[in-house]
């Protein structure tokens, strides 16, 4: 803007959007001592779950544990508002175990609203930001709202979700909206484009909701909760067990598939009205029928939206078909033959900024002090949003306080993997976190997220002194228990030794340490408990953590060595102002990609699409030659 507006108030940081990214970002900056303003279109929809009311799942649960370990909120609120919890992939190794909580969506929003509204240093208010105020150096110094109110600040975090230029579709009918019943954010996309950002479109969708009083559960397969409740948070003060509810499983039928195939042309994508890319790993039901034409049936999960609402979420059944057809489709599912639809499914397309325009700190490359987090960066999922939110919040606070910003290496956390992928790879579809995206998943488990990240959270000031004491006490217990298991031995001829041989079917030669016993296949800590050899002072989670560390010690040590070896080369910094076009040994594609993305390290450069190993070698040789020339110049001078 050419002339500065009259600022109504001044803050250190302004966060635009109060979804899952925005709440984590605002809480982080406020807790780190920044006076923070959190602006939202609707104070009654803070941390709303517009799609599935659930947190966690494969790879996503690891993100939640990591955010919690850093001092974030998503895990704590999920633990306080769950209606069902299950451990997914329990029959596989601990690297891919995934805790998933079905949450009460209204309670979740209310609890998070209470948290942000009672956070010191944080003001939450309504407002639609349409413009950014920059100084002469293209550094952000404020925002302006649709109704002309301006606020001064030193940093802005954009966490706008699906609201930027949002448009929802049901069949060929559409309207401007960020979510059903909520108007879209207008103006900010145009501002960002005017400032030189690349702005593109993505699409997502949500299924219909039906009235649970109209559903016949006897025709479905119950999906009960786990008997042993597990927790996202490492803070025992939020571990309150509550009554749980069942989810249910039904399946599509030949009639479902027939109706979809006959009416594909009526959907926004197949009808040609929307060409934005949707999420590959959360496809619409019509995409499933087209892409997996040989499959006779698809699983559909029926999930409660809360304890005190009749609404059921029909997971796996999002669609862009017209509303009258949606009811016909729903009634082809066993158990839903007489269902009443309370809300139709819809698709939503929205603007986003490809995240290659951000540094791994999540600050944009074009504008100092401007950060982006969540769906505006091209991700899908509450957990991915929360992870980016806390990183953007940490770094916005450090930017304001003139402290060095923090980059999360991909080999140390799923958060690091997520952000490295976003800032390095050219993604043209909504990005979802998967365990397969991490090369280091055996080390990056849920159970050790606090060991990996809580020291950092404490060092930067996000983890409180009380939380730090809880963490340290836990580490002391784990160390003491590991030592006890190493030194406690049982003899084959003793009654307990004979009982264990009988229980496991595995012989004990003369005597065996409990640690060695736990290393054996099929032997778990519960066996020690059963025979009076366990430690009653440990929580179930701590017993599990000790067992994993012992049972997989060899694999973990090997992966740790690989990480250290790779890190030595990966972390080699690249000059921010390096002229890649002046390096003739690089391919032209590599020069273009490296110039556009401007990676901070050799490791990041190696993961850019179009940059091959030969280019990395050429880059290393060039840097070596430049370093030698500088050394010679220094000696000669």
From Swiss-Prot:
InterPro entries recorded: FAD/NAD-bd_sf (IPR036188), GIDA_C_N (IPR049312), MnmG (IPR004416), MnmG-rel (IPR002218), MnmG-rel_CS (IPR020595), MnmG_C (IPR026904), MnmG_C_subdom (IPR047001), MnmG_C_subdom_sf (IPR044920)
A GO term, aspect molecular function: flavin adenine dinucleotide binding
Residues at which FAD binds: 17-22
Disulfide bonds: none
Keyword Nuclease: no
Swiss-Prot/TrEMBL cofactor(s): FAD
SUPFAM superfamilies membership: FAD/NAD(P)-binding domain
Domain of life: Bacteria
Gene Ontology CC terms: cytoplasm
Function comment: NAD-binding protein involved in the addition of a carboxymethylaminomethyl (cmnm) group at the wobble position (U34) of certain tRNAs, forming tRNA-cmnm(5)s(2)U34.
Complex and partners: Homodimer. Heterotetramer of two MnmE and two MnmG subunits.
Name by which UniProt lists this protein: tRNA uridine 5-carboxymethylaminomethyl modification enzyme MnmG
Annotated gene: mnmG
